[in-house]
Structures are given as structure tokens and as C-alpha cells.
From Swiss-Prot:
Domain Helicase ATP-binding: 558-724
Mutagenesis or variant effect for W18G: Abolished interaction with XRCC5 and XRCC6
Sequence ranges of the Sequence repeats: 424-450, 451-477
Primary location: nucleus
Acidic residues: bias regions: 507-525
Gene: WRN
Motif KBM 1 location, chain numbering: 11-23
Region described as 2 X 27 AA tandem repeats of H-L-S-P-N-D-N-E-N-D-T-S-Y-V-I-E-S-D-E-D-L-E-M-E-M-L-K: spans on this chain: 424-477
One Pfam match: Helicase_C
Domain notes: The KBM 2 (Ku-binding motif 2) and XLM (XLF-like motif) mediate cooperative interaction with XRCC5/Ku80 and XRCC6/Ku70 and recruitment to DNA damage sites. The isolated helicase core (residues 517-1093) interacts weakly with the HDRC domain in vitro.
Native organism: Homo sapiens
EC identifiers of the protein: 3.1.-.-, 5.6.2.4
Name assigned to this protein: Bifunctional 3'-5' exonuclease/ATP-dependent helicase WRN
Domain HRDC: from-to ranges: 1150-1229
Length: 1432
């Protein structure tokens, strides 16, 4: 034992001196006595930053703000710089930089919370590496190495304030930031340990943390400025003080001080009893004693420090605590610098563990307080830092010493592994199913990492993957660790929570579907508020160009003007929500404050308002024009501000309210307030103080996307008081929805949306293509440019000027298509976007709805397409694993599952979207479109193949046996692997990944009847339905598949009962031919059809018609010689397309209107270019359509067009000249308003007036589906999402209108008709057909009510009715909007129960003679209701 002790002692003596903690303490003890703190430090006021703090946690916003900073700074300008990171060491790794602070002026500081961002923002990186901008701070050299290690960012042109101070002050001090603040500013920093040592990586930061961080950066900025203006001749310190300070002056000062002290000593006995604060006096005396001691040492010196009298230390001052904690933080900074420098040279994983233990020892020693109460903790710790840093950075360590350190670290590392390996799974558990490369834009992940729970105190050792190479290396390391058995499972907690994942079940989905099945409601409701008066309508027309308010608009405006009430308005895109906040201040004559996060959109709206003679401005940090003075003078009606500016300038708003008056405060895009929304922004959460500061000003929160939970969150966060909540329908009836699968070939995927011109390809109108990553945007752009297509790329990695140029060119129609990440779109003010294409699966329903909302804002027909692949869903699911807030992550998983169902579904896509937003008026909003070929690809498919929802919608199959096999396989393999291994098990694979023990199981190889891709698709279906769940296991790149509670319960039940599981089938699980209804046969000339892929081979006539419906011809390609019949501009909105009361115009008139429209578009483009404004701001497409119809020639007449204000009317004068010239050249009428019509159109209207079917939109659709498509009533009811009774009543109204109807197929057979007629003729009815209730009571219950109504209408019309017993073969459609010949529908003898031709003939002879006149009526009707084009 003694020998071992000697060896140990010898080994310890060989260790370097700097490793001996005792020696280190002694060295510090010897040097600390010369450092004394100022006696006045405790009385110094605290330095506090009073300007506005811009807190950004989103990578995209951070890039934008950084670029704004760069643009606002000149070369050589300086910003205050500082960084924060968690103080803890975890598993041998130091915490990464969590927060970067930049102070650009005395009034503004930016906090960039990079720990909540998935990747480091490109704009911030460019700013930090910009040599033209100086970054000033203390310890900034260490910060440089920290940034280089954590993010590979080379901080350039940094200024170390310590060096500048020593140079200016001619001294050699070791300064801390606090000591510089004390010396130069006469203040001190508030160093609260609970704040400075808090976890800076947690989201969001507290207000105290924000103020602390901003103050540090501000201190660096203001110190640099003070040092710069400090004259070199001013010397506060000198190396030889005798040369700078006269001896006589020092004598005078010392004598004066001694006299004052003696005088105080004389007065003390009499004044002591009257002292209010004796303790404070004692503290001041102690401070004086300390400084006197220091002064004595400096002047006289001391030969014996040990025995010399020292000041009393019996008081425990709070300042010592501050200084000690300050030392801890500074020490950590130095240690970070050391480790960073070492890693940059040669970094070995074992050094992580060495650094960890060494760091812990040092920290432990640092926290211990010294007994000497007067010691200056800050300076003491600075001395320690310098010593330790010098030691650690020293190259004097011997090779033998280094080997000892490495050996110790390796032994600890291996022992830790040996302990943990007993709890690990076998090294064979190394499956990695998600081995795809992530190349994602910050914008796609903008919400994934920002919703971190404040209570989540777990240490996260993962780091952000910033490149493909990092990802691949991390995955390779993961596999190596698996093979060596050195990885600890971390999935148990996630697995426990995700087993109960509340993904939407089939029952829940059906509840959503049935939400609207409550019967039809009236389109118009009587409102309880008074109509606008004449003065209000005049103001509306003068400034906004409208003759009336929409009902919901007036509801909001009236409550603001008359009741001064808060409002939450959820309005579909294109409804006109901007009028709700623009009109009140214009009418009242005061200021309206509009808060919006979108600078580009605000600039466009300001321009648009100015063109309508409404004074408006944008007020913000990026505003170049000085408008603040004019605002205070009340010269502006509408003022746009950012949420950051608003929250930082409450005093200005209160001043405006007091001096001028604020009519309202509008919060646009209010869904950004909610943490559960798809576009949450923290700056919006601060707007809750608005109501406190301005309690009498009504707040109007507006958005286009907000479910009920988000609406509640908006009310709560804004502190709204008894708000009026108003919702329009979420439906956008002019948008056609379509989903397709990607093929992997970009050009092949996008070609269906392109048209070929003489020289190049082009889209059918302005188009946005959304991509999930920057890399994909560049790939798509490259492919499209091969076709000479004018397009541009837009993403956050581009410079601000480049992005602004792309936006400018797109809104001015200089480029036709923008390929962008989701950073683009919300801020665009372009109403005529015809197509929105998602090249990749959207991440959730809310963001998808917001993005497609960019299309068709002018009310004209537009289309929205999704091109996706299963890998897109995998990528989105993987990104969700980054969310540390478990509750929010599960919520996002549920939202993503809904999106996945949308992509797979064969149901009406419009219905899926509307049911997600809980639209209670889903059927009301969609009566004119849902179930038609203009609704979505699924609805069009049903119409093309004449089958109903019964046959096709969500075709259900029993997948019970397959589900039992797959769930059992996952369970048998212990839920330790991804889905790949259970599939190999079921398919009987010989792969070495599958252990031999599993090959003897009875289920092994039982799934050979299905392909591997089928099983993977089926597993995704089970995940979507909530039977399986994927969770992270070893690290975030590897997933295991586990049973949820729902899946385990089903499996247990299937073991004992029947194995039945009814799921929705899609094209991956069932062959396409099986998805077609068995009762229907597709003709041999029709291409095999897939429900999720629309492009089927159509007849020439139908194809031409669809092109007319959905195509858009650019202005520069239109001429009088164009083939307009095949490709028109665009049809009108669907609300009017199905209204059979619209007059039918002649082909000549339609041709005239279309050619004139093309000339107007050209003239608008030229005029807009001269004015340097976007064409759509000058005049929307809808205004041009109306101008082509009405052909006004005077300014007064153009004002009569809806949407043309007085200001705009004058600007449209050049377009009136175009109309005059065109009409004179072609000899056509002008100024065609309600009192006049084209001569030929008048004649046509007179002929058609008495023969047109006066059916509503909804009734016309039902009639067409029944009479022409030959769909059964039940199928129509399911397709239209309406009750069967409602469908029947639609047909009874068709009978009343005199439209031909196949009565027998409707259910009104002669037998039923006779029963009803007998009831009506006999008592007690006695032929009184007004007694509907009595008739209903007497007619047998099995006869539906709508049949009674039909029979009554037939009896009323008598022989003049145009009804028919069956559809004539040669009859054409009477439903407006189609030219397709109605197919014959001959019923078999079995269907009608007739056995012989004779009996059939006798039956026909018994029918009323007037039944045979249907053919005539139908022909005349069809002639009248032929489809018009854009201008019908």
C-alpha cells in the first residue's frame, strides 16, 4: 500500500503547476491585494437601455432585419456587440451561442435568438462578416472564436474596447464591461445573477433577459462612442503619475480630506443618536478605510503585507456578491475561448470529456466566496482568468503530461459507456429509415423551433445541421455508435407521450364532414344594424369606388363608428377586409393606425391609397421620408406601422390620441399573434399593451385564417373587451383545387400548366411556385429557364436588393412566374395571380390556405395545384422532431396528418379545407361551386365518369388482415426499429439486418403477396390514422416505429375477435381500376383515370371548353386575329357562371369584348410603366373586364364602374381614349350601362326571356347533375353535401320553372302520382293545393315530401308543362355552361317492371298528352342558355 501511495504522490508531483488548485489560489491571493474597488461604486446609478428592443427568433425575419441594418449603416460605422449562451456544460460540450445582440443607435437594439432557429440566418452571417461595419465589445476576440466554432462564422472588423480604452486613457488596465461603464459613464451595470446565469437558449426570452442583453450591447456602443470623442490630450491615468499630478495639489487634497474627517469625528458624539441610517454610515466608513489603505500602499509602500493593519471586514456587502457572479460569467467566457481555440487546431472527442470535468472543477472553485469581505471580486476573477487562460493556452505542457490527461479522460469515457451499454439494445438495431438529405429553407421551418416551453429544463445536446455534409457526417457517426453499442436510447419519454397521440380518426373526420349537413340556409340574412346613410355611401364611392358595402364589411365598420367596439374579423382572402380599417378614419377625418408585419405590402397599400387621394404613410425604422411631423399635424388619415415600432413607441400613440384622435387600431394578419397559428411572431404578443395605453380606441383584428381556438387566442392576447367576432365563409369559389404526384422530372411535372407560344413557353397568367427549400427553387428555376420562360427566384438567402427587384418586376408583370420559398407571397399586393403551384407537400392546412390565398384576389377564376411525393411528408415529419414543446409538437403532427389526408383523399377537396376551419356555413358558401367541375379534381372526376360519392368518395376497403400482420410484426420485433425491418420480416427477406431468431416465427414471410412499396404506403396510412407512430430513438435522424394506444387496443381486439379495419383506399393501396365504381363502365376511348390525378383524355369539344374556363391569355399576345374561341382570357367568377338568369350574349359581342379587353390590358401596362406603379394598382382585371363590357368614354361614366374612385377615374383617362378609338374603328356602341344594351343582345334577350329556366345557382347544379349527368338523387345529395330532401326540392322547383325532368327516375312514377292526385281531389283536401300540411298527413309516409310538391306543380301546370317522362336521346343540355350532348338513359324492363312491349305502349298511352311536349321546350331552352365566355 505504501508503494502505491508513493507512486501516486510521484505522479501528482509530475503534473503541471497550473493543475494544482492550491497553487493557483495562492498565486491569486498574492496579487489580489493591489486591486481595490471604488468607494462610490455602490451609489452609482444603473445603466439602462431605454430605446426600442427588436426581438427576432425567426431566421427569415432575422435575415431581413440584418439586411436592413447593413443598408442603414455607412462604411466605418460601429455597432455594439455582445453574445449570450447557457452557462451549463453538458456531456463535454459547451453551450452554443443562444443570443446575439447588436445595438445600432441609442434608440434601437436588435436581439437575435439564434438558438430557436433551425439554421443560422444568412443575412446575419453576412452582417457579422461585413468588414465595413465595426463590432465593438469587451472580450470580443473570444466571441470571434466562439462564433467560428459554433456556426463557422468569421467575425470581421471587431473592436476590443479594452484595447481602445487603454490606448485612449494611456493605461494598461484589464477592463471589464462594467468597469468601463463605471469609469466612463459614471454608472454601473445591473448584474443580477438570476438573469445573467439563466438559460439563454430557452424560448421566448423574458423581458428582464431582453433588457439585460440589450443593455450590454448598448454599453458597448456608447462606450466606443465616448472613447472615440475622448481627446488624446485628456489623461485620466498615467504610467508615471508624478509627471501628471503636481505634488502640491496632492498635499492640498490630503490635508483637506483629513480636516474634514477630523471635523466629522468631533460632531459624531452629538449626531450619532440622530442618525437615520447608522448601517449606511458604517458601510461608507468601511469603504473609506479600504481606499485609504490602498492609497497608503501606493504612496508609502509596505514591506510586510502580512502584519500590516488592514481595514475591518466584518460587513458582508452586496456588491461582493455581484462581483463574484461577474467573475463566474467572465471565467466561463475565457474558458469558452480556450476550448474553441483548441478545437480549431486539433479536436479530439476525448478532450470533450476532459474539458467537461476540468470546467466543472474550475466552476466549483469559482463559486466559493473568499473570507476577505473587501476583496474586489470582479478584478480578482479577471486575474484568475488571465492566469488560467495563459496556462491552458501554454505550449509548455509535456508530451507525458498530455498522455496522462488523455488516458484519464478515456478511462472515464469508457467506464461511462460500459455502464450505459447494459441498458442498450443490440448493435444490430441500426436501421435508419430517414436517410434523406435535408436542404430546407429557414422559412419552411419558421414555426418548428420557436415554440419552446419555458418549463422545458432538459439539456439538449443536439446541434443544428447547417449543410448536407454535416447531416451525412452526423448520420455516419450515429451508425458507428450503434455498431459499437455506445448510444443511449432517448425515446422512452417521447414514446410514452406519442402512444397517446391524438391524430384525427376516421370518426373525427366524418364529424367534420357532417358539420355542414344541416340543410340549406338563405343566402341573405336580415341584419340588426341600420343601413349606411347617404353621406357614408358618398364617401365610399368617392374614395374607394364602391356603391355599397358588403354585409360583413358594414357590420364591422358600423360597430367601430357608432359603438367604438373592438372587433375580430375573419374574412376570406379577396372579401375586402382592408376596407374595414381604411374607411372609418377617412370618413371621420382622424387617424387610423394599421399594424402589419409586411413592409412590402404596406408600401403598396400606401401607394394605392395615395392614388385614390387618401393621405397615407408608412412609419418605421426603415422609413426614409421624415413623416413624423406631418403625422403629428394630422395630415395623414391612415398610418401603417410594424408591430415592433408600435410596441416601442406607445408614448407617440398616446400623444396622437390626445392631440388628433385615433379612429381605430387595426391589427392586420392577426393570426400571427397566436402561438398555435401557422405564422406566429413574438412581436405581435406585445401588442396586448395597446388596450392598456389606449383604452378608448377600438381595436380591429383581421385575418383570413383563424380557427376558433386561434380566434380565442387573439382576443386574449390583445386584451380585447367584449369584442364583436365576425366570420365570413372561408370558401374561395373562384379557386380550382388539384393534387398530383411528382414524377421526379420537374419539366414533366410543370408542363401541364404551360402553353406553347411561337417562340417560347409561358404560364397561363402570373404564377407563384412554392418550393420547400432554396435548393429546390434554384432547380425549378433552372429547368424553366431552359424553356426561355421569364421567371425569378425568391428566398431568404438572397440579398435584400435582389429580392426587392424580383418583387418589383413581378407585380409590374415584367416576369410571369416567381419560384419561391414560403417567405414570398404574404407581402405581395398582386390581385391577378392565376396559378399557385406547390412543388412539394405543404406542411399544414392553415399555411396551405394562406398560400393559395394569393391566387385570384381579383375574383376571376384561378387554380391551385399541389405536386407532391411521399418523401415530402417524411421531410415535414422529420422537421417536427425539432420542436421541444411536446404539446405543440403533437398539435403540429395532427395538423400535418390532416394535410396528408387532404393529399390522399378522393373526397371534395374544398369540403376538406372548409371543414378544417369549422366553417358552419360550408354549404352556403359553396352552393355555386361544390360538386361541379370547377370545384376540384375529385369533383371533376366524379362528373366525368358519372359516379357519385357512394362509388368513389373515400373508397373504403377492409384492410384488417394486412393491419394485423403489420402491427403484429412491429410488436414482435419489440418496437425497436423503423418500419423497414417489420416489412422485411413480413416479406420473408434474407437480409442480415433481420436476426435469425425471427425467421422461425409463424408470421415470417406472410406478407409476400404485397410489394415493399405497398407495405410502406400502408404503414403511412396506419400512421395517419393513429395506429402507429414514429418517434426519435438514438438521435433526431433515426426513427423507430411503435404502436400507439389506439393501435395496441385494436391489435388486442383483433387477436380475440374479427380482424376488420375499414380504411380509406388510395391509388397506392389499391389499383386505379379498382377505385373506379364497379357499376360504371368507362368507355374504351377514355384513358384510365386516377382520382388524385386530373389530366384525363377529353374529347375535343370538352377540352376546348375547359381551356376556356381555366386559361389566361397574356396581354401582349392578344390581338383581333387571335383564336379567342379556343383560349379566352378568363371566365367570370363562378357565382355568375351558373346563374341562368344572366343574358346570353352573341358570339360577335363576346369577340368584341375580348379583343377590347386585350387592348385595355396593353394600354394599362404602358400607362403603369410611365407612372412607375404596379398595373393592378392602377386598375384591376375586374375593372378592365367591366370597361370592356360597358365601354365608357367619359370620366363620369367610368366612375360608374365598381371599384373606380374619383382619384382613379382621372388616371384612367388614357384607357378611355383606347375605348373611343376601338369603338369608332369597329362601329360598336359605347357607354353600355343598365339603361342600354347592345342591339343584338337586346334582341337575343327578348327572345330568351320567356324560355329561360329561372333557377338559382344551387338548383341549376342539382338539375344538371340529375337530368344531364343521370346521377341518382342519393348520389347528388352526397356529392353536394346536402340532405336528400333539399335535392328533391330543387327538382320540384325545376318542375315549377317548366324545365324538362325525368319524373320516373326522380321517383314520381304514375302510381305515386295517382296516389297523390287522389288525396288532393278527395275530401278533406277537395283540390285545395295550398293545404300542403294536410296533404302530407294523408299521403303515405313512404312517399317523400318533394314528390308531393312535384305532383302539385304538375297538376297546376296542366297540359302547358314541358315535363317529360324520360330524357330524349337527341336532347342537349339546358344547364348553362356546357355543350356536351346528353347521353341516353334507357331504362331496362326490369327497372320499370314492364314485361312486354305491349304493356309498355299501353302505359305510355295512359300518360297525359302534354307530357310529350318536353322536347320542344328543351330545345328552345338549350338555345337560350348556351355558355358565354368572360363577359356573359
Amino acid at each position: 500500500m505504501s508503494e502505491k501511495k508513493l507512486e501516486t504522490t510521484a505522479q501528482q508531483r509530475k503534473c503541471p503547476e497550473w493543475m494544482n488548485v492550491q497553487n493557483k489560489r495562492c498565486a491569486v491571493e498574492e496579487r489580489k491585494a493591489c486591486v481595490r474597488k471604488s468607494v462610490f461604486e455602490d451609489d452609482l446609478p444603473f445603466l439602462e437601455f431605454t430605446g426600442s428592443i427588436v426581438y427576432s427568433y425567426d431566421a427569415s425575419d432575422c435575415s431581413f432585419l440584418s439586411e436592413d441594418i447593413s443598408m442603414s449603416l455607412s462604411d466605418g460605422d460601429v455597432v455594439g456587440f455582445d453574445m449570450e449562451w447557457p452557462p451549463l456544460y453538458n456531456r463535454g460540450k459547451l453551450g452554443k451561442v443562444a443570443l446575439i445582440q447588436l445595438c445600432v443607435s441609442e434608440s434601437k437594439c436588435y436581439l437575435f435568438h439564434v438558438s430557436s432557429m433551425s439554421v443560422f440566418p444568412q443575412g446575419l452571417k453576412m452582417l457579422l462578416e461585413n468588414k465595413a461595419v465595426k463590432k465593438a465589445g469587451v472580450g470580443i476576440e473570444g466571441d470571434q472564436w466562439k462564433l467560428l466554432r459554433d456556426f463557422d462564422i468569421k467575425l470581421k472588423n471587431f473592436v476590443e474596447l479594452t484595447d481602445v480604452a487603454n490606448k485612449k486613457l494611456k493605461c494598461t488596465e484589464t477592463w471589464s464591461l462594467n468597469s468601463l461603464v463605471k469609469h466612463l459613464l459614471g454608472k454601473q451595470l445591473l448584474k443580477d445573477k438570476s438573469i445573467r446565469c439563466s438559460n439563454w437558449s430557452k424560448f421566448p426570452l423574458t423581458e428582464d433577459q431582453k433588457l439585460y442583453a440589450a443593455t450590454d450591447a448598448y454599453a458597448g456602443f456608447i462606450i466606443y462612442r465616448n472613447l472615440e470623442i475622448l481627446d488624446d490630450t485628456v489623461q485620466r491615468f498615467a504610467i508615471n503619475k508624478e509627471e501628471e499630478i503636481l505634488l502640491s495639489d496632492m498635499n492640498k487634497q490630503l490635508t483637506s480630506i483629513s480636516e474634514e474627517v477630523m471635523d466629522l469625528a468631533k460632531h459624531l458624539p452629538h449626531a450619532f443618536s440622530k442618525l437615520e441610517n447608522p448601517r449606511r454610515v458604517s458601510i461608507l466608513l468601511k469603504d473609506i478605510s479600504e481606499n485609504l489603505y490602498s492609497l497608503r500602499r501606493m504612496i508609502i509602500g509596505s514591506t510586510n503585507i502580512e502584519t500590516e493593519l488592514r481595514p475591518s471586514n466584518n460587513l458582508n456587502l452586496l456588491s461582493f456578491e455581484d462581483s463574484t457572479t461577474g467573475g463566474v460569467q467572465q471565467k466561463q467566457i475565457r474558458e469558452h475561448e480556450v476550448l474553441i481555440h483548441v478545437e480549431d487546431e486539433t479536436w479530439d472527442p476525448t478532450l470533450d470529456h476532459l474539458a467537461k470535468h476540468d470546467g466543472e472543477d474550475v466552476l466549483g472553485n469559482k463559486v466559493e466566496r473568499k473570507e476577505d469581505g473587501f476583496e474586489d471580486g470582479v478584478e480578482d476573477n479577471k486575474l484568475k482568468e488571465n492566469m488560467e487562460r495563459a496556462c491552458l493556452m501554454s505550449l509548455d505542457i509535456t508530451e507525458h503530461e498530455l498522455q496522462i490527461l488523455e488516458q484519464q479522460s478515456q478511462e472515464e469515457y469508457l467506464s461511462d459507456i460500459a455502464y450505459k451499454s447494459t441498458e442498450h439494445l443490440s448493435p444490430n438495431d441500426n436501421e435508419n429509415d430517414t436517410s434523406y438529405v435535408i436542404e430546407s429553407d429557414e422559412d419552411l421551418e419558421m414555426e418548428m423551433l420557436k415554440h419552446l416551453s419555458p418549463n422545458d429544463n432538459e439539456n439538449d445536446t443536439s446541434y443544428v445541421i447547417e449543410s448536407d455534409e454535416d447531416l451525412e457526417m452526423e448520420m455516419l457517426k450515429s451508425l458507428e455508435n450503434l455498431n459499437s453499442g455506445t448510444v443511449e436510447p432517448t425515446h422512452s419519454k417521447c414514446l410514452k407521450m406519442e402512444r397517446n397521440l391524438g391524430l384525427p380518426t376516421k370518426e373525427e373526420e366524418e364529424d367534420d364532414e357532417n358539420e355542414a349537413n344541416e340543410g340549406e340556409e338563405d343566402d341573405d340574412k336580415d341584419f340588426l344594424w341600420p343601413a349606411p346613410n347617404e353621406e357614408q355611401v358618398t364617401c365610399l364611392k368617392m374614395y374607394f369606388g364602391h356603391s355599397s358595402f358588403k354585409p360583413v364589411q358594414w357590420k364591422v365598420i358600423h360597430s367601430v363608428l357608432e359603438e367604438r367596439r373592438d372587433n375580430v374579423a375573419v374574412m376570406a382572402t379577396g372579401y375586402g377586409k382592408s376596407l374595414c380599417f381604411q374607411y372609418p378614419p377617412v370618413y371621420v377625418g382622424k387617424i387610423g393606425l394599421v399594424i402589419s408585419p409586411l413592409i412590402s405590402l404596406m408600401e403598396d397599400q400606401v401607394l394605392q391609397l395615395k392614388m385614390s387621394n387618401i393621405p397615407a404613410c408608412f412609419l418605421g425604422s426603415a422609413q426614409s421620408e421624415n413623416v413624423l411631423t406631418d403625422i403629428k399635424l394630422g395630415k395623414y388619415r391612415i398610418v401603417y406601422v410594424t408591430p415592433e415600432y408600435c410596441s416601442g413607441n406607445m408614448g407617440l400613440l398616446q400623444q396622437l390620441e390626445a392631440d388628433i384622435g385615433i379612429t381605430l387600431i387595426a391589427v392586420d394578419e392577426a393570426h400571427c399573434i397566436s402561438e398555435w397559428g401557422h405564422d406566429f411572431r413574438d412581436s405581435f404578443r406585445k401588442l396586448g399593451s395597446l388596450k392598456t395605453a389606449l383604452p378608448m380606441v377600438p381595436i380591429v383584428a383581421l385575418t383570413a385564417t383563424a380557427s376558433s381556438s386561434i380566434r380565442e387566442d387573439i382576443v386574449r392576447c390583445l386584451n380585447l373587451r367584449n369584442p364583436q367576432i365576425t366570420c365570413t365563409g372561408f370558401d374561395r369559389p373562384n379557386l380550382y383545387l388539384e393534387v398530383r404526384r411528382k414524377t421526379g422530372n420537374i419539366l414533366q411535372d410543370l408542363q401541364p400548366f404551360l402553353v406553347k407560344t411561337s417562340s417560347h413557353w409561358e404560364f397561363e397568367g402570373p404564377t407563384i411556385i412554392y418550393c420547400p427549400s432554396r435548393k429546390m427553387t434554384q432547380q425549378v428555376t433552372g429547368e424553366l429557364r431552359k424553356l426561355n420562360l421569364s421567371c425569378g427566384t425568391y428566398h431568404a438567402g438572397m440579398s435584400f436588393s435582389t429580392r426587392k427587384d424580383i418583387h418589383h418586376r413581378f407585380v409590374r408583370d415584367e416576369i410571369q412566374c416567381v419560384i419561391a420559398t414560403i417567405a414570398f407571397g404574404m407581402g405581395i399586393n398582386k390581385a391577378d395571380i392565376r396559378q399557385v403551384i406547390h412543388y412539394g407537400a405543404p406542411k399544414d392546412m392553415e399555411s396551405y390556405y394562406q398560400e393559395i390565398g394569393r391566387a385570384g384576389r381579383d375574383g376571376l377564376q384561378s387554380s391551385c395545384h399541389v405536386l407532391w411525393a411521399p418523401a415530402d411528408i417524411n421531410l415535414n415529419r422529420h422537421l417536427l422532431t425539432e420542436i421541444r414543446n411536446e404539446k405543440f409538437r403533437l398539435y403540429k403532427l395532427k395538423m400535418m396528418a390532416k394535410m396528408e389526408k387532404y393529399l390522399h383523399s378522393s373526397r371534395c377537396r374544398r369540403q376538406i379545407i372548409l371543414s378544417h376551419f369549422e366553417d358552419k356555413q360550408v354549404q352556403k358558401a359553396s352552393l355555386g361551386i361544390m360538386g361541379t367541375e370547377k370545384c376540384c379534381d375529385n369533383c371533376r372526376s366524379r362528373l366525368d365518369h358519372c359516379y357519385s360519392m357512394d362509388d368513389s368518395e373515400d373508397t373504403s376497403w377492409d384492410f384488417g388482415p394486412q393491419a394485423f400482420k403489420l402491427l403484429s410484426a412491429v410488436d414482435i420485433l419489440g418496437e425497436k426499429f423503423g418500419i423497414g425491418l417489420p416489412i422485411l420480416f413480413l416479406r420473408g427477406s434474407n437480409s442480415q439486418r433481420l436476426a435469425d431468431q425471427y425467421r422461425r416465427h409463424s408470421l415470417f414471410g406472410t406478407g409476400k403477396d404485397q410489394t415493399e412499396s405497398w407495405w410502406k404506403a400502408f404503414s403511412r396510412q396506419l400512421i395517419t390514422e393513429g395506429f402507429l407512430v414514429e418517434v426519435s430513438r438514438y438521435n433526431k435522424f433515426m426513427k423507430i416505429c411503435a404502436l400507439t394506444k389506439k393501435g395496441r387496443n385494436w391489435l388486442h381486439k383483433a387477436n380475440t375477435e374479427s380482424q376488420s379495419l375499414i380504411l380509406q383506399a388510395n391509388e397506392e393501396l389499391c389499383p386505379k381500376k379498382l377505385l373506379l365504381p364497379s357499376s360504371k363502365t368507362v368507355s374504351s376511348g377514355t384513358k384510365e383515370h386516377c382520382y388524385n390525378q386530373v389530366p384525363v383524355e377529353l374529347s375535343t369539344e370538352k377540352k376546348s371548353n375547359l381551356e376556356k374556363l381555366y386559361s389566361y391569355k397574356p396581354c401582349d399576345k392578344i390581338s383581333s386575329g387571335s383564336n379567342i374561341s379556343k383560349k379566352s382570357i378568363m371566365v367570370q367568377s363562378p357565382e355568375k357562371a351558373y346563374s341562368s338568369s344572366q343574358p346570353v350574349i352573341s358570339a360577335q359581342e363576346q369577340e368584341t369584348q375580348i379583343v377590347l379587353y386585350g387592348k385595355l390590358v396593353e394600354a394599362r401596362q404602358k400607362h403603369a410603366n410611365k407612372m412607375d406603379v404596379p398595373p393592378a394598382i392602377l386598375a384591376t382585371n375586374k375593372i378592365l373586364v367591366d370597361m370592356a363590357k360597358m365601354r365608357p368614354t367619359t370620366v363620369e361614366n367610368v366612375k360608374r364602374i365598381d371599384g373606380v374612385s374619383e382619384g382613379k377615374a382621372a388616371m384612367l383617362a388614357p384607357l378611355l381614349e383606347v375605348i373611343k378609338h376601338f369603338c369608332q374603328t369597329n362601329s360598336v356602341q359605347t357607354d353600355l350601362f343598365s339603361s342600354t344594351k347592345p342591339q343584338e343582345e337586346q334582341k337575343t334577350s327578348l327572345v330568351a326571356k320567356n324560355k329561360i329556366c329561372t333557377l338559382s345557382q344551387s338548383m341549376a347544379i342539382t338539375y344538371s347533375l340529375f337530368q344531364e349527368k343521370k346521377m341518382p338523387l342519393k348520389s347528388i345529395a352526397e356529392s353536394r353535401i346536402l340532405p336528400l330532401m333539399t335535392i328533391g326540392m330543387h327538382l320540384s322547383q325545376a318542375v315549377k320553372a317548366g324545365c324538362p325532368l325525368d319524373l320516373e327516375r326522380a321517383g314520381l312514377t304514375p302510381e305515386v302520382q295517382k296516389i297523390i292526385a287522389d288525396v288532393i281531389r278527395n275530401p278533406p283536401v277537395n283540390s285545395d293545393m295550398s293545404k300542403i300540411s294536410l296533404i302530407r298527413m294523408l299521403v303515405p309516409e313512404n312517399i317523400d315530401t318533394y314528390l308531393i310538391h312535384m305532383a302539385i306543380e304538375i297538376l297546376k301546370h296542366g297540359p302547358d308543362s314541358g315535363l317529360q317522362p324520360s330524357c330524349d336521346v337527341n336532347k342537349r343540355r339546358c344547364f348553362p355552361g356546357s355543350e356536351e350532348i346528353c347521353s341516353s338513359s334507357k331504362r331496362s324492363k326490369e327497372e320499370v317492371g314492364i314485361n312486354t312491349e305491349t304493356s309498355s305502349a299501353e302505359r305510355k298511352r295512359r300518360l297525359p298528352v302534354w307530357f310529350a311536349k318536353g322536347s320542344d321546350t328543351s330545345k328552345k331552352l338549350m338555345d337560350k342558355t348556351k355558355r358565354g365566355g368572360l363577359f356573359s
